[in-house]
Every structure is written in C-alpha cells, then in structure tokens.
Swiss-Prot record:
Known partners and oligomeric status: Homodimer.
Catalytic activity from the UniProt record: sn-glycerol 1-phosphate + NAD(+) = dihydroxyacetone phosphate + NADH + H(+); sn-glycerol 1-phosphate + NADP(+) = dihydroxyacetone phosphate + NADPH + H(+)
Pathway per the UniProt entry: Membrane lipid metabolism; glycerophospholipid metabolism
Encoding gene, per UniProt annotation: egsA
Protein name: Glycerol-1-phosphate dehydrogenase [NAD(P)+]
Organism of provenance: Staphylothermus marinus (strain ATCC 43588 / DSM 3639 / JCM 9404 / F1)
Coiled-coil residues: none
Length: 355
C-alpha cells in the first residue's frame, strides 16, 4: 500500500551549466525575478574570491546590485553563525556561495537562517553538497550534515571547475561511488526497521554513480566533457536528497566511516576519498563482488585504495570502522547496531587489500 502521508519536495528552480558564464549571473538572476532590489551577499574563500568571487562581484555591481562579500577560511558553526548575523544586519536576500564545499555550505546555512535565496556557484566538483539541502559544518555536536535550504539555483561554470586541482574532481567521483552502498543501506533499513524508502530517489542516486562508472576513463583524462559528467551526476545526487527529504539516498555506512575518520584523523584526506575507500569495504560486507570492480576503477582514476595511499595509519582506519555505527545511531546500515569488532575490522581491511 502507498504511504499516504504528506511528503514535501523542494527542488532547485534552475540548473545552469556552461563555460565562461560567471559574468552572466546577473542575467540569470533577473530571469528568476531576483532583481537588483534585493541585496546580495557573496560567501566565498580567500583563494576562490580571487579565482571566481571577484568576477561575480564585479558583474553584480555592474548590473546595479548592492553586494557584500564574506571570505571565510573555515566552515565551522561559529563562522556560519557569524555570517548569519552579519548578513541579517546588511539585509541580504540573495546568498551566492562561490567556491568549494565550505563556501556553498556556509551560504546554504545563512540563506536558510535568513529565509533568503541561495545560489550555488561551485568552483570545484568535489562532493554533492553543491545541490543538496544539507550543510557539513564543523564544531556542531555531531559530525554529520545539518539541514538547510535547497539551492534556489545552481550555476556551474565548467571552464572554471576544469581549472580546479584534478584531485578535487577525483574526490567528487569518490563521493558518487558511495551511492552504491548508501542505497543498499537505505533498502536494508526499510526492510528491517520499516524506514521510509523512496524508489525514485534511490534510483536517481544510483544513476549518478553508474554514470561516472560508465565514463570513468573520460573523467580520468581531464576532458571538460568528463568534468561535466561529474558535475551533472553530483547535481543529480543532490536532487535525489531533495526528493527523499533526507540524505539517505546519498549517505550510508560509507559516509559514517568517513565521518569517523574526520573525528580520528581530521584533514588527512578529502571527503570523497574517504567515502570511496569506505565504499569498497561496505560492498564487501554486503557480499557484493562489485567491490573489486570499484577498486579497479578507483585505481584508474587515481583515487587512493590503500591506507598508505590515503595517508591515514591502518590502525586509525580500523578504529574508524569500529566506531562508525555510533556516529549516527538512528541511521541503520550494514554496520548494524553493535558495529564491527576490532577483529572483524582487521579482517575486512585485509580481505579488501586496504592494508
């Protein structure tokens, strides 16, 4: 029987993907009825401001917008709350997150708290936060995502994103590979715990993973067409979360493992690199032979597949595996409610060649 409860879905109004389009942002805003009667705030970073933020600022000012700029060095909750207060004082209504994950997460949070319009302008394709209604803020009581607002629009300049370090693109692919286990975990929670499961959102998330698997060689070549595939897949994954109303289709046991690593070895590796490594191991736990194929693809792309390559001691990886289930106790996954024993974790890293 169909679930008759009310399920509200908020999707981005527009997704614009092209090359050399940052200076056209005012035109796009105008088409969305976001005229220069609204004050705009650009949330960016010191480096990304010089690369992209400055272009957006000048284009906005040339079109009569009053613009304030925030150059944040981190995405801690204290920084986020400070930006919330300052943007409120300035009467900001259009929040442009220009940069990587930190800038976009801060802009989403500020827009959410101020009931504004959030415009996602990624300069890298390193994870699916560019389109999701969640933000990853450090310093909160839990190392998981915070609900925010769905981006009102996503404006992705492929030319700009192509100039980002290749490692960031690879990280984006790693985040997408994680959907393979995230959806399995969601299905498991549905069967064992009666949790809501949305087939459409699940299939959309899986499609984003399958898309990068299919075109992994093109992506590895650094071709702009490959970059575009990663960007589109990351946006699809973000939209899957919007449809589900949670991060379930995009975040499962592989993300719990990554969050555990964030606690034990902060800043050692990129989010997508950690997620991809977790995906290999979680697929193995499911008895899915696909883990070998995923590992081969990761090697081809240049993603780390061992503890040595990711730069984290194997003892830390084992510890992360044993505490991952505690990160988000209400999120049921293949790790179960009691998690892995240390012995089981060591066996897992040996069997999958992480050690």
């Amino acid at each position: 029987m169909l679930n008759r409860s009310i399920h509200e879905i908020t999707l981005p109004l527009k997704v614009i993907i092209g090359s050399n389009i940052l200076d056209k942002i005012p035109d796009y805003l105008l088409k969305m009825k976001l005229t220069n009667q609204y004050k705009a705030g650009i949330i960016t970073g010191p480096t990304t401001y010089n690369v992209a933020g400055k272009i957006v600022e000048e284009a906005m000012k040339n079109n009569g917008y009053i613009v304030e700029v925030w150059k944040a060095r981190d995405a801690r909750i204290e920084t986020a709350n400070q930006i919330v207060e300052e943007t409120k004082k300035h009467g900001i209504k259009i929040f442009l997150g220009v940069g990587g994950g930190k800038s976009i997460d801060l802009a989403k949070y500020a827009a959410y708290k101020n009931n504004g319009y959030m415009i996602s302008v990624p300069t890298a394709a390193s994870h699916d936060g560019i389109a999701s209604p969640f933000a990853s803020l450090k310093g909160t009581s839990k190392p998981t995502s915070t609900p925010t607002t769905t981006p009102y629009a996503i404006i992705a300049d492929i030319d700009m994103i192509s100039k980002a370090p290749p490692r960031l693109i690879r990280s984006g692919v790693g985040d997408l590979l994680g959907k393979l286990t995230a959806v399995k975990d969601w299905q498991l929670a549905h069967r064992l715990k009666g949790e809501y499961y949305g087939e459409y959102a699940a299939q959309l998330a899986l499609l984003s993973a399958k898309h990068v698997i299919r075109y992994h060689e093109l992506i590895a070549s650094g071709n702009p067409d490959g970059i575009r595939i990663v960007v589109e897949a990351l946006i699809s994954s973000g939209v899957a979360m919007c449809i589900a109303g949670s991060s379930r289709p995009a975040s499962g046991s592989e993300h719990l493992f990554s969050h555990a690593l964030d606690l034990l070895a902060p800043g050692k590796a990129l989010h997508g690199e950690q997620v991809a490594l977790g995906t290999i191991m979680m697929l193995y736990l499911y008895g899915d032979p696909k883990w070998k194929k995923i590992k081969r693809i990761m090697k081809k792309i240049g993603l780390p597949t061992t503890a040595e390559e990711i730069g984290i001691p194997i003892e830390t990886i084992v510890k992360a595996l044993t505490i991952a289930h505690k990160i988000r106790p209400n999120r049921y996954t293949i790790l179960g409610e009691k998690g892995l024993t240390e012995e089981a974790a060591w066996r897992l890293v040996r069997e999958t060649g992480i050690i």
